[in-house]
């Protein structure tokens, strides 16, 4: 079981549709730490850390569109090394 952290930027209709809240719920269900945050360009930034297989499941869920009310057009991911210790999965403003 290896731990990884990723940062993802999710583009499409992802703000104002409950995207951060459902991402938080899914990440908590998978046992991940991190956060979801609305960005000024209309995207959502997601940082997720935990077991590599569980992080992959979250990425797959994000690529599949997240909540039904959202529409994901594009997702970019890369490895990430947070400068802070992340506990739980939060929504940032």
Curated annotation (Swiss-Prot):
PROSITE patterns recorded: ACYLPHOSPHATASE_1, ACYLPHOSPHATASE_2, ACYLPHOSPHATASE_3
NCBIfam families to which the protein is assigned, alphabetical: PRK14426.1
Signal peptide (residue range): none
GO molecular function, one term: acylphosphatase activity
Active site: 20, 38
A Pfam family per the record: Acylphosphatase
Catalytic reactions of this protein: an acyl phosphate + H2O = a carboxylate + phosphate + H(+)
UniProt key word S-adenosyl-L-methionine: no
Keyword Hydrolase assigned: yes
Homology family: Belongs to the acylphosphatase family.
Class of the enzyme per the UniProt entry, highest EC level: hydrolase
Keywords for the protein's UniProt record, in alphabetical order: Disulfide bond, Hydrolase
Protein name (database record): Acylphosphatase
Disulfide pattern: 5-49
Acylphosphatase-like domain segment(s): 5-93
SUPFAM superfamilies xrefs: Acylphosphatase/BLUF domain-like (SSF54975)
TM regions (residue ranges): none
EC number of this enzyme: 3.6.1.7
InterPro entries: Acylphosphatase, Acylphosphatase-like_dom, Acylphosphatase-like_dom_sf, Acylphosphatase_bac, Acylphosphatase_CS
Organism of derivation: Salmonella typhimurium (strain LT2 / SGSC1412 / ATCC 700720)
């Amino acid at each position: 079981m290896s731990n990884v952290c990723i940062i993802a930027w999710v583009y499409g209709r992802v703000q104002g549709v409950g995207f951060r809240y459902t991402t938080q719920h899914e990440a908590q269900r998978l046992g991940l730490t991190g956060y979801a945050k609305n960005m000024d360009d209309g995207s959502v930034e997601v940082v997720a850390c935990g077991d590599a297989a569980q992080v992959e499941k979250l990425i797959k869920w994000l690529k599949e569109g997240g909540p039904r009310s959202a529409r994901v057009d594009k997702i970019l991911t890369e490895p990430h090394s947070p400068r802070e210790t992340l506990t739980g999965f939060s929504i940032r403003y």
